Structure formats: C-alpha cells, structure tokens
C-alpha cells in the first residue's frame, strides 16, 4: 500500500471527521464517502488544503444500485499533480434529492454533471445549465439505470420519404435469445438456421 495514501487517509479523517461517512483504502486507491450535505465543503478542502492540493477534477460518474434507498453513487475522481496522488470522493443520493453542483469549485464539472444527469437522472442543485448532453431531444428515461430496458423504448431512423429523422416504437425482429452461460457445452435450446441438416442427422 502506498504510504502517502495511508497518511492522507488519516489526515482527511482527522480534518474532515463528521463530514465523512467512511474512508476506504483498497487496491492501492483511497476512496472517501462524504455526507450529501457536506460535499461542497469536502471538495473545497481537498482542493485548497496544502497537504491535499487536488486541483484537477478528471471525472464525475454515476453508479446505480437499485436495491438501495439511496440508489446512486456520485463519484468524483481527483488528481493532485504536486503530490502525484489520486483521490475518489463518493456521495450517495436518491432519484429526487439533488447533489450540490461542483461547478463553482471545479469549472470543468459542468459537462460531467450534465452527463450524470442525462445517463442516470441524478439531479445537481446550483448547476448553471442542467440539461441532456448525450441523448437526443425528447429522449425518455435514463439509459444507464439498471431498470432501463436493454432495447430502449423507441428507435430512430432516417425516413427517406419524409426527409427527416423519425422515432418509432421498438420492434424486435427476433425474440431475445436464451443462452445457458453456466454450461461450457450447452448452447441455445433451439435450432439455428444453419444447423437444420446437422440436427436432422442425429
């Protein structure tokens, strides 16, 4: 384990104390879990404190745990070039409780937060322009949530006659296949189009 991360973990526990829910040192990485109402204070501290100096926000991502009451983790990936250290800060929230925006602390957070909103529906209070960034206008749902259907709700295509993009309900050309992933020898329970002859010889 990197000795610098062990020292940093102890330092953050000492300085941030009640603002943190837990600290995790695993696989050579330090993760701290912040209370939802303390996230801006924690981010400002790790940016401005001379022992930390995590001045670069490299990513904000979401993770969906549908079985939890606070189903979303918002994960901030930070870099301190001066100390050559990385830090992950997590905060937990639900579908209706917004996380305070980090845009005033890290200006680069704006597009990362828009992506988390678009993909997961995570809300950020105080964001200057919280709207979709990757999906199309009028898109329904949030595609990286675990309860979002794999096939989606609609499909879009260019209609040559109408000379525009149109949206239609998803039509599956074939049923979902049933694969037996537990057996290395057993395949699908039906005959594939190219195997009729082989099946007839049995």
Curated annotation (Swiss-Prot):
PROSITE patterns: COMPLEX1_30K (PS00542). NCBIfam families: NuoC_fam, PRK06074.1-5. It comes from the Bacteria. The keyword Translocase applies. Belongs to the complex I 30 kDa subunit family. One of its GO terms (molecular function) is quinone binding. It catalyses: a quinone + NADH + 5 H(+)(in) = a quinol + NAD(+) + 4 H(+)(out). It is a peripheral membrane protein. InterPro entries: NADH_DH_suC (IPR010218), NADH_quin_OxRdtase_su_C/D-like (IPR037232), NADH_UbQ_OxRdtase_30kDa_su (IPR001268), NADH_UbQ_OxRdtase_CS (IPR020396). NDH-1 shuttles electrons from NADH, via FMN and iron-sulfur (Fe-S) centers, to quinones in the respiratory chain. The immediate electron acceptor for the enzyme in this species is believed to be ubiquinone. Couples the redox reaction to proton translocation (for every two electrons transferred, four hydrogen ions are translocated across the cytoplasmic membrane), and thus conserves the redox energy in a proton gradient. Keywords: Cell inner membrane, Cell membrane, Membrane, NAD, Quinone, Translocase, Transport, Ubiquinone. It is found in: Cell inner membrane. The gene is nuoC. Its EC number is 7.1.1.-. NDH-1 is composed of 14 different subunits. Subunits NuoB, C, D, E, F, and G constitute the peripheral sector of the complex. Its main location: membrane. This is NADH-quinone oxidoreductase subunit C. Pfam families: Complex1_30kDa. It comes from Bartonella quintana (strain Toulouse). The keyword Transmembrane does not apply. GO terms for cellular component: plasma membrane.
């Amino acid at each position: 384990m990197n000795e610098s991360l062990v020292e940093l973990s102890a330092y953050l526990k000492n300085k941030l104390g009640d603002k943190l829910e837990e600290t995790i040192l695993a696989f050579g990485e330090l993760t701290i879990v912040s209370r939802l109402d303390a996230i801006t204070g924690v981010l400002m501290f790790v940016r401005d404190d001379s022992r930390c100096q995590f001045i670069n926000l490299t990513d904000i991502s979401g993770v969906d745990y549908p079985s939890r009451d606070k189903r979303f983790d918002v994960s901030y990936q930070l870099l301190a070039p001066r100390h050559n250290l990385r830090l992950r800060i997590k905060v937990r929230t639900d579908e209706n409780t917004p996380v305070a925006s980090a845009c005033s602390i890290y200006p680069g957070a704006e597009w990362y937060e828009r992506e988390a909103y678009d993909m997961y529906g995570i809300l950020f209070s105080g964001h200057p322009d919280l709207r979709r960034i990757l999906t199309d206008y009028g898109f329904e749902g949030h595609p990286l949530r675990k309860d979002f259907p794999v096939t989606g709700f609609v499909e879009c295509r260019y209609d040559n006659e109408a000379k525009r993009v149109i949206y239609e309900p998803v039509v599956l050309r074939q049923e979902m296949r049933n694969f037996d992933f537990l057996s290395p020898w057993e395949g699908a329970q039906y005959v594939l189009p190219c195997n009729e002859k082989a099946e007839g010889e049995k």
